[in-house]
Amino acid sequence: MALDELKSAIPDFAKDLKLNLGSVIGNSDLPQQQLWGTVLACAIASRSPKVLRELEPEAKANLSAEAYTAAKSAAAIMAMNNVFYRTRHLLSDPEYGTLRAGLRMNVIGNPGVEKVDFELWSLAVSAINGCGQCLDSHEQVLRKAGVDRETIQEAVKVASVIQAVGVTLDAEAVLAE
């Protein structure tokens, strides 16, 4: 199993990450589609080749073709939106917030899977990319759809652990050169 290979690659000094990776994926209360879509979208957002290579096959095996594509779409559109909306939020001039975005985001309206799943994946990617405005927006949509805070936090835990594993393994690869 690729998850076991990924866990075994984590150095001893990051044992907490190894344990957390096993628990957030192996013991998650999220339904399979939500879990593996979150895993795939976050593996992409982590920008870690090792993490993506190890987690993608299992994600693909646990997702329908539509969900697999939608999770990749969530990572792609959030890569754009998180930069755009984080910048608008951080700029001191509030007038930027009144300007039309002018960016295509059609996939958000028609992701090819349940809207709640896509929103959850988008929220998790937004956590990795650090866009508070996007986090708030996706959290509000999820809460209005009846998603509880525990489910939202579970997706954020998956995001945080995958990101930390990616940073750790990529740093170790560089230091080993």
UniProtKB/Swiss-Prot annotation:
Its recorded reaction(s) are: N(6)-[(R)-dihydrolipoyl]-L-lysyl-[lipoyl-carrier protein] + a hydroperoxide = N(6)-[(R)-lipoyl]-L-lysyl-[lipoyl-carrier protein] + an alcohol + H2O
Q: What does this protein do?
A: Antioxidant protein with alkyl hydroperoxidase activity. Required for the reduction of the AhpC active site cysteine residues and for the regeneration of the AhpC enzyme activity.
Q: Which family does it belong to?
A: Belongs to the AhpD family.
Q: Which domain of life is it from?
A: Bacteria
Alphabetical UniProt keywords: Antioxidant, Disulfide bond, Oxidoreductase, Peroxidase, Redox-active center
**Which Gene Ontology molecular function entries are recorded, alphabetically?**
alkyl hydroperoxide reductase activity; disulfide oxidoreductase activity; hydroperoxide reductase activity; peroxiredoxin activity
Q: Which InterPro entries match?
A: AhpD, AhpD-like, AhpD_core, CMD-like
Taxonomic source organism: Streptomyces griseus subsp. griseus (strain JCM 4626 / CBS 651.72 / NBRC 13350 / KCC S-0626 / ISP 5235)
* Family matches, as PANTHER family: ALKYL HYDROPEROXIDE REDUCTASE AHPD (PTHR33930:SF7)
Report the gene name: ahpD
GO annotation (BP), single: cell redox homeostasis
Q: What class of enzyme is it?
A: oxidoreductase
Q: What is its EC number?
A: 1.11.1.28
Quaternary structure note: Homotrimer.
Protein name according to UniProt: Alkyl hydroperoxide reductase AhpD
* Disulfide bond positions: 131-134
